[in-house]
C-alpha cells in the first residue's frame, strides 16, 4: 500500500507568479523560507501518515456519514489510490480578488447552489510540532457550478439563480493576486468556515466548484488560530492569527466527469484553462509541492457526491494578513 498523502496547501502569491517584482535578496529569502518549511513538513511525514490513516478509517466505518457509501465502493477505491507525496506551502500569501472578510461561521456553505455534493475532510497539522492543530478556523470560498462567486454578481448573464460572473474590471489573472475588486452584492453562497475539532479535523459541505475564464477549477482556503466569532455569526477576520492562505485543485479526469453533468454544462464561461495551463497551479505544484486534493467519487453515481481529503501543514508561528477591503455585512 502506498503511503498517505500530506497535502499542505501551496500558497498563492502575486509575487510568486511574477518574480520580476522581487529583488535578488527577496528571492533568496523566499527560497530559504520554502526550504525550511519543506524540511519541517517532511520531518512530520510519519505523524501525517497516521493522521490521515485514522481519518480515513473513521470515515469508512462511520455509519452516519453524510454521503452514501453503499456497496463498499468508496472504501475499495480509496485504499487503491492513496498517493505517496509530502508537500509544503510557499511562504508568500495572498487571497485573490474575490475574498470577503467576515464570512459566516458554518460547516455547510451550499445554500441554494446546485451541483455535485462535495465533502471536504480537512486536517490541519502544525509543522513545528508535527501535531494536529485543534480549534483552527478553516475557511473556504470558491466559484459555483457555472463559475460565479457570491459577492461579485454584477455581470450575471443568467444562470441558475443568485449567480454572477467574475467581474471583468478585475486586473490580474482572476484569482491569484490580491487586487481588490469591488463587491456588487451581499450574497454568501459557497463561503464560510468552521473550526477543527480536538483532533485537528473539520468537515465542510459544499458543491464541486466550477471553472471560470482564465482559471482552472480550484477552492481557496485560509487557516487562522485565536479567532473570534462575532455576535452576528461571522468570523472577525482581522482578529485572529492568520497562518495560511492557499488554493486546492482537483484531477482533470474528475473535473471532466463533473463538468459533463448538469448544471455545469449550463455555464457561459469559456473552458480554455485546464490544470496544465493554470499559472497559479504550476507555481504551487512544483518543487515537491502537491496542490491536488485526494478526491474520490462516492457511490456508483456522480450525484451521490465526492469526498476530498486535504491535510494542510501550517507553521503556528507564522503571521500573515488579508489585503482585501471587502467585508460581508449580513
Cite the ranges covered by each PLM segment.
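Peripheral, solvent-exposed domain-edge segments
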Residues: 17-86, 260-330
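Short linear sequence elements within intrinsically disordered, low-complexity coil regions
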Residues: 12, 103-104, 279
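Beta-strand-dominated extracellular/periplasmic modules and repeats
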Residues: 69, 73-275, 316-321, 327
